[in-house]
């Protein structure tokens, strides 16, 4: 990995005040304390903490489990049928902003149809004892269904007003990320019931899907709101190189596949790419020349460990690490890689109610790890 700063490039439009920054120099890894708090999970993909400190965990083959008191429940009944081939399956999980009153749990998953598959989102009501999910209803479907098993995106995030944002991969069909009549390679904004807000940027334009909030994305598997600015941050997989962190702006084009810092897995240029920048498009805040294969993202805004304040934690699948980006406002000041010694693919990252960082390892016998700062080496 190249470890020098690239020069800042001012955006051609006013979406962002910062230019893209290549991966920053990394200090020597700091020690962390790690404990395995759950094991035997089948390719766990996401977790969401409940108000009582327990957590819901999705397993990609199609199960939802409750972790409570150090133990995993049996699979919770009441889930939809998922398309669990290749990269598909049961993916993200999020709680309703009003969960304490309504008990609604949102799930993103791959759904088969028309001979292919696409991302779907639904919600159901979790029983008080956490043993069943009732009245599951699909509230959103990616159309058309184009995936043969790749690039679902499928992260969920609610903003402070209760709107639901969903990241959608381009189903490994590159040009569709620029097609505004399709929902591939997009981030969409919905009401909590799945209906479309009238103030979405393209609402009323019959040539454009009204759900679209931003476009030009490849496979966005990180989505979270910055707790200090309120802005929506996203990260996405590049092809061979070019993983990105972006600040998402209303109606913006993030370039894929017309602009990328990556190349094809074959080593050849992306056929549609015109360079690393797209005229009138938004550039990444931060990018990597060598892809860590980013998945899952969490801002650290807890009080328990001040040394981690204003950090952004990101999972890495290929690099088998927990990436910590130190932030100064909307700038990345430093990067370090944690958990490298474990040799585990990190699929999701969340901050727990106790202030610890929790990560899921992606494996046939995956685990939930609790991570806290240790003594400096």
Locations of regions flagged by a protein language model:
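Acidic, Gly/Ser/Thr-rich repeat motifs that build Ca2+-stabilized beta-propeller blades
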Residues: 23-174, 222-225, 230-238, 290-328, ...
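Blade/loop signatures of beta-propeller domains
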Residues: 23-33, 131-133, 195-205, 262-280, ...
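Conserved blade-ending motifs and adjacent loop-strand segments that build the rim/top face
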Residues: 217, 332-353
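Short, conserved, GDST-rich strand-edge loop motifs in beta-rich repeat architectures
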Residues: 166-184, 242-244, 248
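Beta-propeller blade signature
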Residues: 120-129, 180-193, 248-249
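Beta-propeller fold detector
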Residues: 35-36, 73-80, 132-141, 195-202, ...
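Repeat-solenoid scaffold signature
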Residues: 208-249
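Bacterial N-terminal signal peptides
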Residues: 8-19
């Amino acid at each position: 990995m190249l470890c020098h700063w690239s020069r800042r490039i001012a955006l051609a439009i006013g979406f962002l005040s910062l230019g893209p920054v290549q991966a920053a120099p990394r200090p020597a890894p700091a020690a962390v304390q790690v404990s395995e708090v759950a094991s035997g999970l089948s390719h766990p993909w996401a977790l969401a903490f409940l108000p009582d400190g327990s957590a819901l965990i999705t397993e990609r083959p199609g199960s939802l489990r409750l972790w409570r008191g150090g133990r995993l429940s049996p699979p919770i009944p009441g889930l939809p049928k998922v398309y669990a081939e290749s990269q598909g399956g049961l993916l993200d999980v999020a709680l309703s902003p009003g969960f304490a009153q309504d008990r609604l749990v949102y799930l993103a998953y791959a759904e088969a149809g028309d001979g292919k598959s696409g991302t779907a989102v639904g919600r159901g009501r979790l029983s008080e004892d956490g043993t069943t999910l009732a009245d599951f209803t699909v509230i959103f479907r990616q159309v058309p269904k184009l995936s043969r098993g790749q690039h679902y995106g499928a992260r969920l995030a609610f903003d402070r007003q209760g709107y639901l944002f969903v990241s959608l991969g381009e189903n490994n069909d590159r040009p569709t990320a620029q097609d505004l009549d399709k929902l591939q390679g997009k981030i969409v904004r919905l009401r909590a019931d799945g209906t479309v807000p009238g103030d979405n940027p393209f609402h009323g334009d019959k040539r454009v899907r009204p759900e679209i909030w931003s476009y030009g994305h490849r496979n966005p598997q990180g989505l979270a709101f910055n707790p200090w600015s309120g802005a929506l941050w996203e990260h996405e997989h590049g092809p061979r190189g070019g993983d990105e962190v972006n600040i998402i702006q209303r109606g913006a084009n993030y370039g894929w596949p017309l602009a990328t810092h990556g190349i094809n897995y074959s080593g050849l240029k992306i056929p549609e790419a015109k360079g690393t920048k797209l005229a009138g498009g938004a550039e990444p805040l931060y990018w990597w020349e060598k892809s860590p294969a980013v998945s899952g993202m969490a801002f650290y805004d807890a009080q328990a460990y001040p040394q981690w304040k204003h950090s952004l934690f990101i999972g890495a699948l290929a690099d088998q690490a927990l990436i910590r980006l130190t932030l100064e406002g909307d700038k990345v000041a430093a990067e370090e890689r944690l958990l490298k010694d474990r040799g585990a693919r990190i699929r999701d990252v969340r901050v727990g109610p106790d202030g610890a960082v929790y990560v899921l390892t992606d494996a046939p016998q995956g685990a939930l790890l609790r991570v806290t700062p240790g003594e400096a080496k």
